[in-house]
Amino acid sequence: MKVVLLSFTLIIMGTLFSNAQTSKSATQSLSSVKVEAYYFHMSTRCVTCKAVEAEAKKNLESLYGEKVKFQAINLEDDANKAIVEKLKISGQTLLLVKGDTKINLTNEGFMYAVNNPEKFKSIIREKVDGLLKL
């Protein structure tokens, strides 16, 4: 009888320990999700459009390295149709994404990338830092 009770207790303990490990690894996986930055653009671009991409990419790489993945995506390229539809993009857009959270920095990019790049950098830092804390 003691052997049966001991065996039963060990099985229950093993199951609980296994579930705790699974839960812990799932939590770690979620917290390691990176922030993604997308700059959606047309084929023909003005000086400001190019500056938004260049400044955003430079700032994200210098501030965050591999913690933030930057991609420039041509809206007119059919190969990009899936990501454009997934993120519901309809025009030139600078977008930060982490999971279901999206932050649109298009207006800030066009206001500051050329005339006040330091202000643009501080806005990027503020928004990305907020996403990394999620």
List where the protein language model places each region.
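Bacterial Sec-dependent N-terminal signal peptides
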Residues: 1-26
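Solvent-exposed, acidic/flexible segments
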Residues: 42-49, 53, 87, 113-121
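Structural micro-motif
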Residues: 84-98
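Non-catalytic, surface beta->alpha helical segment in thiol-disulfide oxidoreductase systems
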Residues: 96-134
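Local sequence-structure signature of Cys/Sec-based thiol-disulfide redox active-site neighborhoods
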Residues: 29-62
